[in-house]
């Protein structure tokens, strides 16, 4: 089977780190020899600098919504071209903590940035490059934020209003409903049930991929 790009998406507190561990474990059980993990924003020296700016902001300066989304796409193109595509080319599988769907949901939905601009940015930066599978961990914003707060200090994005995350979730769900490569999973369940659902979804998808070979 050819190398694949799998992405884990969701709001704060959805359990993406746990999901990553489950996915990597399942891929290794399946005999995948090399699995590369990435996160967005981040993953290259420049992208990590941009991550800090997006997450923490700049003292004394308001970070505008458009500046935010442009930095996210700058970080994304660095990661895709310097890490993800080379890994896939050598036969490795890539598991990403967030990708373009995050921008479409957070900046397009949460921030309310014009849909045409979001599509233009995506098409310009990524072209036809997209994940083979996205696991969207759906969780009510209030529940997710409570989990995030329990981890400690919140970053600039995590401090947004509940209404912001409601809009973000709504956009996630709308996009997932029209894209067959996105699998929506109930992340509000107990951890054991979520992990089991991830394994089941991934195994079913792997079986479908093997059937196409």
Swiss-Prot record:
Keyword Nucleotide-binding tagged: yes
Recorded GO CC terms: cytosol
Pfam families per record: Thymidylate_kin
Gene Ontology MF, one: ATP binding
Reactions mediated catalytically: dTMP + ATP = dTDP + ADP
Record bears the keyword Nucleotide-binding: yes
Enzyme class: transferase
Annotated residues for binding of ATP: 10-17
Keywords: ATP-binding, Kinase, Nucleotide biosynthesis, Nucleotide-binding, Transferase
One Gene Ontology biological process: dUDP biosynthetic process
Superkingdom of origin organism: Bacteria
E.C. code: 2.7.4.9
Family according to the record: Belongs to the thymidylate kinase family.
Function (record text): Phosphorylation of dTMP to form dTDP in both de novo and salvage pathways of dTTP synthesis.
The protein's name in its UniProt record: Thymidylate kinase
The species this protein was found in: Edwardsiella ictaluri (strain 93-146)
Gene giving rise to this polypeptide: tmk
């Amino acid at each position: 089977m050819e190398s694949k790009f799998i992405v884990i998406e969701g709001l704060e507190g959805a359990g993406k780190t746990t999901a990553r561990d489950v996915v990597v474990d399942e891929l290794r059980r399946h005999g995948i020899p090399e699995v590369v993990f990435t996160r967005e924003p981040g993953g290259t020296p420049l992208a990590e600098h941009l991550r800090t700016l997006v997450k923490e902001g700049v003292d004394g300066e308001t970070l505008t919504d458009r500046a935010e989304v442009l930095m996210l796409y700058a970080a994304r193109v660095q990661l895709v071209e310097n890490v993800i595509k080379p890994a896939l080319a050598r036969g490795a599988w890539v598991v990403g903590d967030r990708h373009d769907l995050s921008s479409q949901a957070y900046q397009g939905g949460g921030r309310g940035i014009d849909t045409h601009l979001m599509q233009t940015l995506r098409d310009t930066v990524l072209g036809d490059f997209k994940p083979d599978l996205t696991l969207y961990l759906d969780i009510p914003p209030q529940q997710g934020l409570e989990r995030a707060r329990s981890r400690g200090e919140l970053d600039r994005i995590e401090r947004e209003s509940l209404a912001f995350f409601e809009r973000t979730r709504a956009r996630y769900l709308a996009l997932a409903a029209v894209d067959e490569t996105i699998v929506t999973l109930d992340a509000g369940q107990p951890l054991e049930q979520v992990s089991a659902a991830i394994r089941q979804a991934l195994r079913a998808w792997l079986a479908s991929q093997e059937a196409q070979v």
